[in-house]
């Protein structure tokens, strides 16, 4: 059985024991997090939707980390204008404990 959850404005397809990286949340390592499930799938028919908007997914915070650096480079030709800016998004690594 798997579920579709939303965290940080993005949707993730998860099963039990999956590890996912989501946008920064205000949680500490080892804390349990409850994510609202958009839809839960499974059962005898692979495409059957079991529950909509009524189940939840429980996950544990494994680590906090940062994503790879993204470089933003701005340039105006013939004006000697160049700007190089980097950004690293902070992430939270979650391990799914229970679906449904």
UniProtKB/Swiss-Prot annotation:
Alphabetized UniProt keyword annotations: Ribonucleoprotein, Ribosomal protein, RNA-binding, rRNA-binding
Alphabetized InterPro entries for the sequence: bL21-like, bL21-like_sf, Ribosomal_bL21
GO terms, molecular function: rRNA binding; structural constituent of ribosome
Spans traversing the lipid bilayer: none
Keyword Signal set for record: no
GO biological process, one term: translation
Signal peptide bounds: none
Superkingdom of this protein's organism: Bacteria
Family matches, as Pfam families: Ribosomal_L21p
Record flagged with keyword Oxidoreductase: no
Residues in coiled coil: none
GO cellular component, one term: ribonucleoprotein complex
Function as written in the Swiss-Prot or TrEMBL entry: This protein binds to 23S rRNA in the presence of protein L20.
Subunit structure: Part of the 50S ribosomal subunit. Contacts protein L20.
Family named by the database record: Belongs to the bacterial ribosomal protein bL21 family.
Protein name per UniProt: Large ribosomal subunit protein bL21
Species name: Anaplasma marginale (strain St. Maries)
Gene: rplU
